[in-house]
Structure formats: C-alpha cells, structure tokens
Amino acid sequence: MPDVVVVGAGVIGAACAEALSAAGVDVTVIDRGTPAGGTTASGEGNVLVSDKEPGPELTLAIASRREFGVVLARLPEQVADVEWEAKGGLVVAKGEPEPLEKFAKTQREAGVDARVISPADAFELEPLLTRAVTTAVYYPDDAQVQPVLLATALLAAVRARGGEVRAGVTAIAVRQKDGRVTGVETEAGVIECDAVVNACGPWAGSFGTAAGGPIEILPRRGMILVTAPLPECVRHKVYDADYVGAVGSGDADLQTSTVVESTRAGTVLIGSSRERIGFDDAVKVHVLRELARKAVGIFPFLADVPVMRTYGGFRPYAPDHLPVIGPDPRVPGLWHATGHEGAGIGLAPATGRLLTELFIGVPPHLDPSPFRVDRPAVVGVS
C-alpha cells in the first residue's frame, strides 16, 4: 500500500511525487489521461522570477529557481536532458521608462537580480528587437525548460525509487474512516493509502469537492503561437512590460501581452493570452491575431515568419493569485497542490519540496502560510 496517492501527473503532481519519493515516501501517481498530457503539455516552459511582484509568489519563485539545480541532479541519467536553458530574460518598454524601472527596483529589494540596461545594451542582447524600446531590464536568472520532458523525467525518478505511475485511471472520490483518509476511489477500484494529494490543476476544484475539501480553483485559458523552425533569432525570453500586469491581474476578460522565446528545435513561441471562459477550448482567431500583432511590435522580423501551429490550455487560477499548497484541515490526509496558473512549471520544484517538508514534519524552507488551504479566497470564508 502506498503512503500517498498523487492525483494528477502534470508537472506539479510529478514534482510533489518526486520530492516525496526522494524523502523516502512510498508514492503512487494516477492520472485520468496520460502523464503531462493536460495543462503541462500546453505550457511554454517558463521559469521566471522577472514577472512577479514582491510577495509570497516571488519568494516561492526565487526558492524554486534555486531548487531546480537540486531536482535536476536527482533525475535518472537517461531522462536528465529536459532542455534546461538558463538563457536569461529581457523585459522591454516602448513607452515611459519609469514604471518598468521602478518595478525592477522593488524586485531588487526583494532579492531579484534585475539589471536596468539601456536600449543600446538591449539591442546588443537581442539584435532583432524593435528600435522603439525606451528601456529594458535584464534578468539573468530567468530560464526555460521543456515542460513535458520535465514532468516525465520527474515521474521516471519516482518509478526508479519504487513508486508507481498509472495512466488512464480516473479518481472519483476519497475514502475516509474515523475522520481520516484511507484511500482513493477510482473507476478501476480503490487504492488504499494514508494520504491523497490533489494536483489536478484546473480540475482541482472539482476533485476537491469530490474529496470532501472543496477549493476555489478556476480554469484560465491561454493560447500560444508556434512559428516554423528558424536559425537562432531570439536569444532570451523577451516580453513587454505589460506582461507583468497581465500575469497578476484577476480580470476575467481577455488580456494579451507579448512574450517571445525560441526553443531548442528552432521554433519561436509567441504568447500570451489570459481569459476566464470556463473550459471552452475553441480556437479564437481574434486572440491569435492579437498575439501576432503585439509580437511583431517587439520583433518586427516576425511579420514575415510563417506560423506552423497554435495550441492552448487551461491554467489553474486561484482568486487571490497564489498557489494552494498544503494539508486540508477539513479532511485529515487530504493535501492540495494547485492554483499556480501560468507559473506552474517554474514553481514546481519549490512546491514539491514545501509539500514534502510539511508532510514529513520538518521545518519548511519558506513560510507556507500564504499558500495554506483554509484561506478565505480559496475556501470561500468571508
């Protein structure tokens, strides 16, 4: 019998399972689909400290960036290449320089390496950048990883330590006895365990309800354009200053801002959009046009580059824009790890470590209280 069943084999569930198994916990991971086949597969692979205002999420991001080295070193050699690139990030403004420079100052005070540079220096870093740039901030700690490779490598590490990963298994409910979790009910039968981790991403609210611990997690749709392969033309993760505001916004309406990055395969990824429209997965042409228009405003050469495909996905959004990490006091033995919205790839290592520290009872490496399950925004307490 496993000690813990993790429900959800995306990058957050995989990171939790990997950290738990590294601490000696017997883990089984289940997913109704294929590992990394949901939200994780629709991610860009952002590992960012640059897009977060000072506060708990930035603290988690800084810790997670450091934790990546530890986690990657634990991966089995045959799956260790997850296309990790510590390429750095470049945030640019085309209007008044002061807001971006002021934002960078607050980040530096919070421990982020945020370097204000001149337009000329920005053009040195990115020769094809628009000459309309008025100021820029360089973030050497921003990085990129291939999300599906990362999640599957983390799950491979779990298997290597004796854990189990079961695809195509749908969790229905959590079984309890004498006020504690005793197992997970699935369509394939009951899996007995001492604890359950709800890592269902945008579906975590539904599973939380089924498990007896409802939480307010909503889907937020995002779309990405993918160009045809090109010679290296974008060297860093580049985005406009509006991206920071869009990331932190709770607005349900469509928001778009520009983030452009190349991949090892030579394609260029163009985002990003945010929209709360439930689980409507229809391709919205007007969203794609807006992404393309804004990307050309940052990199004019993209106007002549063909788009090979587009994809989108649903990100788990919490109303106060903070992840939910930790035990559910209403259901002893039920844990949650969700609500990271579009930052889950980058926040996964620290999330897995924090949940594991709380689970095994060692002092956590950062303050877990901002992410607790029983906060008003998550459980609806007024």
Model-derived segments and their meaning:
Residues 3-28:
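N-terminal Rossmann-like FAD-binding beta1-loop-alpha1 element of flavoenzymes
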Residues 5-7, 191-203, 207, 352:
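Short hydrophobic core segments
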Residues 18-19, 45-46, 80-85, 202-329:
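Active-site substrate-recognition segment that forms the wall
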